[in-house]
Design a protein with these regions (language model features):
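Active-site environment of non-heme Fe oxygenases that use a 2-His-1-carboxylate facial triad
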Residues: 1-130
Length: 130
């Protein structure tokens, strides 16, 4: 897991143009499953009306086809590379092996999550609260 806001802050400080591009360029995410197709288009870094970071949407697996002008496409790919590079720095990550009975609660608009290799069986259940 890693805190998306922390990466956004680093990008703003170290690569301000990349941060601005990731806040400007809309990316479509898509989910298909269980008889539904959900699509949403938003920038990777979404800010509220006050300029405060409201949501980080970075998911390489749910990204739909991207159709952009050449300059925006290059800027988006540069931003994705920069974001992904920071996200994969060990000091940016928090790793924990869940045990039976453990519960993990986090803000899905701020914390990004994934999984690493493991041995054995696992069963997970997820829920969303609005």
């Amino acid at each position: 897991m890693f805190e998306g806001e922390r990466i956004a802050e680093r990008l703003a400080a170290e690569q301000p143009q990349v941060h601005a591009d990731l806040a400007r360029i809309g990316v479509t995410g898509i989910y298909k499953g269980d008889g539904v197709v959900l699509r949403a288009r938003r920038p990777i870094l979404r800010h509220d009306e006050t300029g405060r970071l409201a949501q980080v949407s970075f998911n390489n697996y749910d990204r739909d086809t991207v159709r952009l002008a050449d300059d925006d496409m290059r800027a988006l790919y540069a931003g994705i590379r920069a974001f992904d590079s920071m996200a994969n720095e060990p000091e940016m990550q928090w790793r924990y092996t869940l045990r039976p009975g453990d519960m993990l609660v986090f803000d899905n608009w701020r914390v990004l999550h994934g999984r690493g290799a493991f041995r054995g069986k696992r069963k997970m259940a997820g829920a969303y609260i609005n």
